[in-house]
A protein has these predicted regions:
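C-terminal nucleotide
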Residues: 1-2, 6-8, 15-71, 75-77, ...
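DPxDG-like acidic metal-binding loop motif
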Residues: 95-115
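Hydrophobic alpha-helical hairpins/lids featuring a short glycine-rich hinge
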Residues: 82-89
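Glycine-rich active-site/cofactor-binding loop and its immediate structural neighborhood
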Residues: 282
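Helix-loop-helix module between adjacent transmembrane segments
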Residues: 91-93
């Protein structure tokens, strides 16, 4: 018999997409087991409640969240439960699905254990679990995007401080963005950790091109913020172009001939700018398209293996409830 059921959902991206969601469901159990299920991956792991949960490549995110929350928030006392998750975006999509899963699992545990932890703490915990406990390389923006939701300008500091500044983007600007953005899933799964490692190694090696590229990406974030607030779509297009060129210069693995072919086809059909989401290398591509050219670009993209999606933004971050 299940005694308690907690459900949680969240969206991701720096401006989270409402069509890309991750869910976590916790059910407490009478039988002395811990069961992890990832329904989108058709994966399941069951362990006796008194057995250690070792990270071995099988549902490690689930295990790491359970271990951390039990150790630090339940005085080490194991709980018999089933933790089930699924995500609309596939792993390697570039939309931060892994980070979002960690965030929603933490939020679900916080609801289960009645923990008074705020959004900053949840995002910080998610970053620690994914980057330290699971030793997965990456940044911090995905965890904060999924936790807070909405349009934000994020500032990260060397001492692990983060400041999340909500942006009051006018509704007409959001509507125009939704009408102008086209998402295309390339079907190419990529290891973001490898690309991020390449970028980090280039910077540590003193590569001038890599350093300039990283500064360029930071600079375009500031430009994009101002353009969003003003509704300067010409500026958004140019910032998107410059940001993509800077990202490609940060590491050779960010792009490849197939992605460039897709990009060129979309531009030829009328798109004004484009980029690969996340670290790069595959996953989702995003294009800025004048609404009157939208169908032309979609037809051009459909010549490639992949999936076209619309773009809708959400104002909400993770949410949890009981039934």
């Amino acid at each position: 018999m299940c005694r308690r059921i907690v459900m949680c959902m969240g969206a991701t991206c720096s401006t989270p997409l409402s069509t890309v969601n991750a869910y976590a469901v916790i059910k407490t159990l009478d039988e002395p087991v811990v069961r992890f299920v990832a329904t989108d991956q058709q994966a399941e792991k069951v362990k006796a409640i008194d057995e250690p949960l070792v990270l071995n490549g099988k549902l490690d995110l689930h295990k790491a969240v359970y271990n951390h929350m039990i150790r630090h928030y339940n005085v080490g006392k194991a709980i018999a439960l089933e933790l089930s998750t699924f995500c609309d975006a596939p792993a390697g999509s570039g939309l931060g699905s892994s980070s979002t899963l960690v965030v929603v699992m933490i939020r679900a545990f916080a609801e289960l254990l009645n923990l008074p932890i705020d959004d900053y703490t949840i995002a910080h915990l998610a970053h620690k679990i994914e980057r330290v406990d699971c030793d997965l390389q990456g940044g911090r923006q995905d965890q904060y995007s999924a936790t807070f939701g909405g349009f934000n300008f994020m500032e990260f500091y060397a001492d692990e401080r983060a400041v999340i500044n909500p942006l009051r983007v006018k509704n007409w600007i959001i509507c125009e963005l939704e009408a102008s953005l086209v998402l295309f899933y390339t079907g190419i799964s990529r290891e973001s950790a490898k690309i991020i490692a390449d970028q980090s190694n280039n910077v540590r090696a003193g590569s001038v091109a890599a350093m300039e590229a990283m500064h360029g990406i930071k600079r375009e974030a500031l430009v994009m913020k101002e353009c969003l607030l003003r509704g300067d779509f010409g500026g958004i297009v140019e910032s998107m172009r410059q940001g993509w060129e800077s990202k490609k210069r940060s590491a050779k693995t960010v792009s490849n001939p197939h992605l460039e072919e897709i990009y060129d086809a979309a531009i030829s059909a009328g798109a004004l700018a484009g980029k690969v989401s996340g670290a790069g290398g595959g996953g989702f591509m995003m294009f800025f398209v004048p609404p009157e050219k939208r169908m032309d670009v979609i037809r051009a993209l459909k010549r490639f293996e992949g999936q076209v999606s619309n773009c809708h933004f959400t104002k909400h971050g993770t949410q949890a409830w009981r039934i």
